[in-house]
Amino acid sequence: MSTVKHQPWAAGASGHMTHPIFGNVWIKDTQGLDYEQPDLKGRYCNKLFTWLEVDMHGRCWMCCPSWLPYNIGNILEDSIEDIWNGPKAQELRKQIFSGDWHYCQASFCPVIQSDNLPTIDDVLDGKQSAHDFEKQMLQNKTVTAPVLPTYINFSNDESCNLKCPSCRTTKLLYTSGSLYDKRKAINDKMIEAFLTTPTDRHFGIFVTGSGDPWASKIYRDMLYNLDGKDFPNLSISMQTNGVMYTPKLWDRIHRIHNNLRDCRISLDAATKETYEGKTRLNGDWNLLLSNCEFLDSQQEKYSSFNIIYDFVVQYDNYKEMKQYIELVKERFPNHKQIAFSMVSDWGTWSPEVYNQKCIWKEDHPEHQEFLDVLKDPIFDSERVVLGNLTSMRRKALQQ
């Protein structure tokens, strides 16, 4: 990819700031990252036309907030219809046609980093799959969508059975009280909009970008009550730590087995010591591996059910990256992908601790050792995805 100068609201800036259109914005820290902003003129991202993510405050996003940190409205204040085609949503879509992409945090986006954004021409020519309404929007260069989002990310409940230091400072589990009520009110609005009336519409939900779907009473009740027969073309994807995803729970959700699609299980370690002592506090390594072996066997029965094993790279675990690939290949042979990404700032660490964890920063004392790890040919393995670490490996191989 060719490169252009950093934009004022993109990868060159960090911290809290006030944007003239979007108000208060938090740009994640990328200082110390050896990175150049790519030239994305003529490229296309379907997130801006299809994706809605709702967080615990009711704020609505058109992508992961770390990658596109501008919310387009609040579900507690406005209808989904008004938010989806409101002025903020339209403003974000304009960058597809202007080609400057200055709102995206390209350094954190794994799709941009791995150069996997299709061209607009490929979408229009049918070389890249897309909905008909997407093609019509591209042809007409319109920034108002004719249909509601086709992918909905439930990120409104942070409840989790673990307390991973990169994500939170204490265990969060909402089962009653005002904080629970607020999160359930948001969830009820989303259910009302997308999961109340049976339909054969093709759409998907993702649970969850905020906690664990099985630790959350809100999500657990929602998934237990869903009947796939009412939504035959609904795809259900999940992100979970896997500890509670037991064979017993699997049997409990038998009515949605045929709706299950991608399941992202985040281990962030290749050893029991690192997992239970550093990256996944309150976790149970042996139970996790047992659950994953069971889920791996279910992939043989349900061809659309795919498991992606995630690994967020930081100082505490980067030396286990190779071992992680070997572990997944050996123990879970039916996996779809082994996906890596770099740690980002969720506000749980002090600046000093965060910088110590960011092995990707050029000024980190062990940055070269990290690059040496990335030189291993195992990262060329089929089904290994480096995402936003792609540029790091490119740098390592150029040494």
For each predicted feature, which ranges?
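Radical SAM enzyme [4Fe-4S]-AdoMet core and its adjacent flexible, acidic
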Residues: M1-D78, D82, L124, S155, ...
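Short, intrinsically disordered, charge-biased short linear motifs at domain edges
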Residues: D29-L33, T50-W51, P87-G99, L148-S155
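Short cysteine clusters
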Residues: C45, C60-C64, C104-C109, C160, ...
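Extracellular structured ligand-interaction cores
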Residues: F49, H57, P69, W101, ...
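Conserved alpha-helical substructure of the radical SAM core
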Residues: I72, V111-C263, E273-E300, L327, ...
